C-alpha cells in the first residue's frame, strides 16, 4: 500500500508539471538551498540543509530534485534524496507565495528505528522575495514526516534561497525547430559541463576516531562529480561519493566552486573549495558538516574524454573526522567548441524517476528482516554520447522494507535502441558504492546489471520496466531487482565555449 501511495505522489508531481510545459525559446532553472531544524524524539534537534535544482515548467509550477543532509546536531550522515515540486503565486511585484511538496527517501545515524522504511514527505508554505539578479530569498513553515514506521514527525520554520539561470531546453531529441535571436542568445547562461567517475583514497589523521571512540582507519570512496563551467575559468561543482572500503555506509555530498587554467591545449590545472555533509559507517563526523579544499590536474585524451588527479584536505567541523585525500578521475566534457558549431552545442539528456524492488537472493543478504523485500526510490541522469549509448549516474534510497538509511550510488554505460514502433530495448552495466539499512554490503563495492523494455508515450516522455541483478563484491548481499521508471527526454542547447578546444 505504501509503495502505491508513494508512486501515486510521484505521478502527481509529474503530471502536474509535464502537461503544463509549454515549449518556449528560453526556460528558467534555479539552484536551491534551504535550511531547517527538525525535532527528533527526546527533543533532540537536527539541522538539515537542502541542495537541489529546479526547472520552471510554467511561470507558477516548478519541479526538480535534491538532497537533504544533516549538518548540525549528532546525526552526521543522515541524508535523503528525492523529488521536489513547487507552486508559486505572485502577491506583489516582488513577493510570491511559495508552496510545495517533496517526496524522498533515506536516513542514517539511527537506522530504521529513526527513519523507518525511509520514506520522507515534506510539505511547506511561505513567502519569497525577489532580489532581482541576486535571486529569491524566502522563509516559511514546513512539516516533515517519515510515515513508513519512522519516528520523525516535525513542524519547523525554514529559510530558502534560489538562484535562477536561463537555459534553452527543448522536449525530445528531434531536430530543433527554434532559433534564438541575439538578445535571447545573450541571456542564455553559458554552460560547459563535465561528468567524472571518481575513486578517492582518504588517509585519516591520527586524531580521527570512530563514533565509538576507536581509531578510524583509512577509507576508499567511489562516486561522481559534476561540473558546470560559468565562463572560461570559473566552475561550480557537485560531487557525491560512498565508501567502497574501510567504513561501509559512509557517504558524502559536497558542493562548491573552483577555478581552472589551461597549461597547454590538453593539460589544465584547477583548484576548488566546497562544503557539504557526510557521515555514516561509524565515522565521527559530528553534526555532518564537511569542508573540502582541493587542487588537481586534468589531461584530455580526446576532445571530450579526460583523466585527472587531485589532492585535497577534508574535515568535519563538528567531529574528529579529518583526512588528506588523493583522487583519480575519468571524465567526459560537453560543449566542446568546433569550427562547425554555430554557438550552440545540443546535449541529449534524460532524467528518470525510478522505483526498484530488491528481492532476496541470498540467505544472509541483510542483518534483519531478511524475509522482506526492499523498495527504493531513485533518480537516474543519462547523458547520451551517441544516439544509442549513454553514461548514467544513479542514486537510490530505501523507503519501504525496514531498511531506512540504505543508499547507493551507481555509474556506468547504458544502451537504448528502438526496435518496434515506440518500443525500445534498454540495458545497463553499473558499479558503485552502497551501504546502510542493515544490508550485508561488505566493503561497500557493488555491481548491478539491468535490462528491460520501454515505451515512448510522447517524444519526450517514456516508461521503462527492467529486470536485473545486484551483488556486493565482497559481501553476502545478493538481490534480484525489478525496476519501473518514468523518463523525461530533452535537449539542452548550450553555449560552446571557445576556451575548450
Segments and roles (model prediction):
Residues 17-19:
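N-terminal signal peptide c-region/cleavage motif recognized by signal peptidases
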Residues 23-37, 61-65, 97-99, 186-205, ...:
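Transmembrane beta-strand segments of Gram-negative outer membrane beta-barrel proteins
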Residues 29, 59-65, 93-97, 129-139, ...:
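Repeated loop/turn-to-beta-strand initiation elements of outer-membrane beta-barrel proteins
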Residues 35, 152-180, 193-204, 322-360, ...:
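Outer-membrane beta-barrel "beta-signal"
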Residues 35, 51-55, 83-89, 125-129, ...:
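Residues on the lipid-exposed face of transmembrane beta-strands in outer-membrane beta-barrel proteins
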Residues 35-41, 67-73, 103-109, 141-147, ...:
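Transmembrane beta-strands of outer-membrane beta-barrel pores
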Residues 38-47, 70-80, 91, 109-119, ...:
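Solvent-exposed loop/turn segments connecting transmembrane beta-strands
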Residues 55-111, 225-281, 378-446, 488:
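Gram-negative (and chloroplast) outer-membrane scaffold detector with strong preference
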Amino acid at each position: 500500500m505504501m509503495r502505491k501511495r508513494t508512486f501515486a505522489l510521484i505521478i502527481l508531481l509529474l503530471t502536474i508539471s509535464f502537461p503544463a510545459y509549454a515549449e518556449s525559446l528560453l526556460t528558467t532553472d534555479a539552484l536551491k538551498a534551504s535550511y531547517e531544524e527538525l525535532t527528533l524524539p527526546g527533543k533532540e534537534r537536527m539541522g538539515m540543509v537542502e541542495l537541489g535544482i529546479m526547472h520552471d515548467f510554467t511561470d507558477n509550477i516548478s519541479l526538480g530534485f535534491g538532497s537533504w543532509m544533516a549538518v548540525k546536531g549528532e546525526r552526521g550522515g543522515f541524508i535523503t534524496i528525492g523529488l521536489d515540486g513547487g507552486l508559486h503565486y505572485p502577491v506583489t511585484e516582488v513577493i510570491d507565495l511559495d508552496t510545495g511538496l517533496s517526496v524522498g527517501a533515506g536516513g542514517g545515524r539511527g537506522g530504521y528505528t529513526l527513519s523507518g522504511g525511509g520514506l520522507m514527505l515534506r510539505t511547506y508554505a511561505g513567502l519569497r522575495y525577489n532580489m532581482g539578479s541576486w535571486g529569491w530569498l524566502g522563509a516559511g513553515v514546513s512539516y516533515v514526516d517519515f510515515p513508513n514506521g519512522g519516528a520523525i514527525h516535525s513542524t519547523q520554520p525554514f529559510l530558502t534561497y534560489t538562484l535562477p539561470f536561463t537555459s534553452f531546453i527543448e522536449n525530445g531529441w528531434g531536430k530543433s525547430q527554434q532559433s534564438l535571436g541575439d538578445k535571447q542568445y545573450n541571456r542564455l547562461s553559458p554552460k560547459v559541463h563535465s561528468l567524472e567517475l571518481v575513486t578517492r583514497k582518504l588517509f585519516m589523521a591520527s586524531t580521527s576516531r570512530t563514533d565509538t571512540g576507536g581509531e578510524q582507519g583509512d577509507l576508499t570512496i567511489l562516486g561522481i562529480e559534476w561540473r558546470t563551467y560559468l565562463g572560461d575559468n570559473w566552475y561550480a561543482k557537485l560531487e557525491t561519493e560512498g565508501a567502497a572500503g574501510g567504513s561501509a555506509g559512509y557517504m558524502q555530498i559536497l558542493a562548491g566552486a573552483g577555478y581552472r587554467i589551461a597549461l597547454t591545449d590538453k593539460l589544465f590545472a584547477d583548484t576548488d573549495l566546497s562544503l557539504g555533509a557526510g557521515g555514516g559507517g561509524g565515522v565521527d563526523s559530528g553534526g555532518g558538516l564537511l569542508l573540502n579544499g582541493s587542487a588537481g590536474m586534468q589531461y584530455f585524451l580526446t576532445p571530450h574524454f579526460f583523466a585527472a588527479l587531485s589532492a585535497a584536505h577534508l574535515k568535519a567541523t563538528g567531529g574528529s573526522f579529518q583526512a588528506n585525500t588523493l583522487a583519480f578521475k575519468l571524465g567526459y566534457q560537453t560543449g566542446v567548441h568546433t569550427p562547425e558549431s554555430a554557438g550552440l552545442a545540443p546535449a541529449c539528456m534524460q532524467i528518470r524517476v525510478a522505483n526498484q524492488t530488491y528481492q532476496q537472493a541470498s540467505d544472509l543478504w541483510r542483518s534483519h528482516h531478511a524475509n522482506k523485500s526492499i523498495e527504493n526510490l531513485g533518480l537516474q541522469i543519462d547523458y547520451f554520447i551517441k544516439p544509442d549509448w549513454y553514461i548514467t549516474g544513479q542514486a537510490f534510497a530505501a523507503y519501504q522494507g525496514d531498511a531506512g538509511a540504505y543508499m547507493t550510488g551507481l555509474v556506468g554505460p547504458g544502451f537504448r535502441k528502438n526496435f518496434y514502433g515506440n518500443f525500445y530495448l534498454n540495458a545497463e552495466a553499473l558499479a558503485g558504492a552502497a551501504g546502510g539499512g542493515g544490508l550485508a554490503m561488505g566493503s561497500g563495492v557493488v555491481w548491478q546489471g539491468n535490462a528491460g523494455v520501454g515505451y515512448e508515450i510522447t517524444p519526450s516522455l517514456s516508461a521503462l520496466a527492467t529486470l536485473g541483478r545486484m551483488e556486493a563484491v565482497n559481501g553476502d548481499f545478493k538481490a534480484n531487482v525489478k525496476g519501473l521508471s518514468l523518463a523525461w527526454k530533452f535537449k539542452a542547447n548550450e553555449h560552446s565555449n571557445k576556451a575548450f578546444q
